[in-house]
Amino acid sequence: MLELHRNTIQQIAAILLTAIFLTGCKEKPLDEGVPEPDGADTLIVCPADSSTIYGTVTNLGKPLKGVVVSDGTMCVQTDTNGIYQLNSTKKHGLVYISIPSGYTVRPAGTVPQFFKQTAKPAGEAERIDFELFKDVDQTNHTMIVLGDIHLFNESSVKAFGTFRQEINSLSGSGIWPCPYVMTMGDMSWDYYWYATPFGLEDYLGQMNGLQGLHVFSTVGNHDHDMMIDSKTEYETTGEDFTCQNSYRELLGPTCWSVNIGGIHYMSIDDVITTDDGTGKDGRGCRRGLTENDREWIRQDLSYVSKDMPVVVAMHIPLFNHNGNDYDKKLGEYTSITSLFKDHDVTFMSAHTHSLYNTVKEDEGQRVEEWVTGALCGDFWSSANKHGVNLCTNGAPGGYRVITATGSHISSVYKATGTDGNFFFRSYDRNTMDFSASLMCPKAPSGSKQQKFWNDKAKVYTGSSSENIVYIHVWDMKEGWTLTVTEDGNALDPVKVSLHDPLFLAANIAGQCNSTREEWSIGTNSTICGQMYRVTASSAGSTLVISVTDSEGNNHTETMKRPKEFSIKKYIN
């Protein structure tokens, strides 16, 4: 069934396509030193009796062995001739590869084309080939992780433009070795697909302004079509599949993997959509995996060495800020983490528009999760109104930068518009008074909005002479240190769980400052679990606050007190 033959013309065409590729995408040398065409072997391939999708994976016409290929349900490997065979129902309408380490693919804009659409009916065999290109040395590489982008209108696009300019400048400067980008879901906002309209196509138009970067995507709850009755579909089939059709067409599979350097990156769809198809008020979701996706994870991991670190991207977190199960079902998160029990795994998520990190031990399995703050912060609201982009727990809007050195990874959260060593903000309680009469004076006495404000801001309400200082270290995790000294004497930071005062002032106060009788909160404040409290000896002493991350990077503030509290004071 297999015949080898020589084809010089096809080899020349491959090299010409590579040249075009090199001038139009990643600013990296790919397939350097390609020899003159000499008629490299190409393959005529016939489908196996049971195959409905088959083909080859090659590099400049030469077969690549051991590349994992999937249809979204099952995974197989190419043989010594670079051939794969899939007995697929073509349910996903896709076939895709797990890009092997050391290789890359052509992009369409910023979207790496590791996937292709099927074209023939389910029972009809079709050939789909993949061409890979050698990448630069990926041993040391950078993954830029973007949580909750939410592009949906003109103001969000304008704010996003500032970030895009920053990324283009930094990635072009060479300070990030071999950079890639991965989103963590909610790139768009399903309601505005119809209201603006602004959909995934428009989002891609903005992302394509990133220069020379490949952007891998994770699906979020707001990247589903809300006008599809996913609730009924899930109840009857165990799948929320149809609402993802637009996503798959534009961004590819919802569960996929790629090998970069010594790291196996995997993105999984942990969103169970329960939209009823009626629009905005009928939306809903929860965390979970379908049985199809569980099986895909098992099969993908079966081809991954136990010695290779795995980084898993998903939208909805495993844990909330205090380490409890985010889904509020005790231990339910283990239905996800147990799939990875034989691997050295780090989980990344988003969804909450807040930033925190968790490490747990469960029956001998170490589970670490980085919940990445939202690039859009509070849906770009505080950025547009006050010039300070804030997540709902007060962390700055920004993105995570993963640095991989061989099989070692580290990460730091970078606030947009700042340098990489911006780890905390400090607040002097003596200069704060969040009384409702000052912060939301329009709210009628005893109104719902005034009560709401009083509950959120009670720790900061009224004058204070207790010399308390609060320090929000948003990305605090294992291996980080916080030290505070007052006139050379060490103070003992105490961890507390509070609402961040800057977010209350920049977002919640404005919402509560309303005379409306029928009032409800829009974007809400969430608890900051990485807040620390120290008590100084006087109102005018100077504190030296120092935070050092696990890689030795340091942010130190000499806090001269009294320190003014105002939104303007904290603009990055």
Q: Model-derived features: where do they sit?
A:
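C-terminal motif of bacterial Sec signal peptides marking the signal peptidase cleavage site
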Residues: 21-24
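Extended active-site neighborhood of metal-dependent phosphoesterases/phosphodiesterases
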Residues: 102-120, 192-304, 330-346, 357-405, ...
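N-terminal active-site segment of His-dependent metallophosphoesterases
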Residues: 43-52, 60, 102-195, 572
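Short, acidic Ser/Thr/Gly-rich low-complexity loop/linker segments typical of extracellular
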Residues: 65, 73-88
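Conserved catalytic scaffold of divalent metal-dependent phosphoesterases
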Residues: 59, 128-136, 149-151, 246-325, ...
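Short, ordered, surface-exposed loop/turn motifs in non-cytosolic proteins
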Residues: 50-54, 59-73
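Bacterial signal peptide processing site
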Residues: 26-28
